Amino acid sequence: DQPGLGKTLQAIGTVTIAKAYPCLVICPAALKINWQREFKKFAGKNAMILDDRNKASWHRFFETKCCNIFITNYESLKKFFVLKVKEDARFTMKSIEFDPRISLFKSVVIDESHKCKSTKTQQSKFVEGICKGKEYILELTGTPVVNNNTDLIQQLKIMGRLEDFGGYKYFVERFCDGPKQSSNVKELNWRLSSTCFFRREKAKVLTQLPDKSRQYIEVDISNRKEYDKAEADLIQYLRTYKNADDEKVAKALRGEVMVKMGILKAISARGKIKVFSEFIHDVIDGGEKLIVFAYLKEVVQELKKIFPEAVTVTGEDNATQKQTAVDRFQNDPSCKLIILNYKSGGTGLTLTASSRVAFIEFPWTFSDCEQ
């Protein structure tokens, strides 16, 4: 589903109706407390967040019928469910020795499953191994395809559905051809919908809501000279690759070019802070709440200095701090502003207290912004 249409509630309902316990929920760290609350709210179930205190004993809570829902984040999968990772030249599923206790789970819910889109990372392989043989596997995401159709391969494999699409080789040849690695899209969409994919769109579901309106505000950045100098430096650097072959250009894009573009992006963001702050003042002085997204940590910090009463959600906050910030923004009438960065605050948080969101800068990937 698109963001905001209740994927969490649907997953809880599915697990509850199917009596698919014990259930493991894998989600971003910032969302663990929210999942725990939602299970209590909608299913009346007490869910346990896995941590160092229950690392060795969590299964006892199920065996004694005290708890049958367990929640962990992607980064902790190795700690709780992997005994050993062999240092093989080629990392495969055979390189991983899993804790036998993973066989206890009847269902696995994978929130923000696009985080498992890579076929090569340990994180994706851990999720795949944990899900193997499970009766129910639910993948939740608003953006199943972040870059191109290859993003679907590992997600389908985790669900045990890749063979329904002809296997890895056929999928790549049929649906990942061409310069954009996307082909036969209509056929792929039909086959997904016919097998394992359920998607709702806001335009079709939330028909009684007013249309979303977008406003673009053009500003003169306060550090124009610094920006022009950095831009000229980038242009001069790119000219050296005017006649370069594709391999050389690709290598450059992975290195110094991206660094220089990042510098340009940072200068631009800093230069917008003064005017952007005036916009924020206009909104909150008018009695409205506002959600602000930024990409760079230093931009969040500068805005926090200007608006010390604001709450923030960043990578430096732990799960409890993030949830506390969200709760205050949602429930405290005097808290008018929340500032988030895309990675930590862009997924899974409930921020319905405001109908206005502003972006001082965009992330590298548009889907992060849309999410």
Regions found by a protein language model. Give the residues of each.
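Walker A/P-loop
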Residues: D1-T14
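Interdomain linker/hinge connecting the two RecA-like lobes of the SF2 helicase core
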Residues: Q2-P3, S113, T119-K120, N149-L156, ...
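SF2 helicase catalytic motif II
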Residues: R90-E139
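SF2 helicase/translocase ATPase core recognition
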Residues: E112, K134-G166, F171, V205-L234, ...
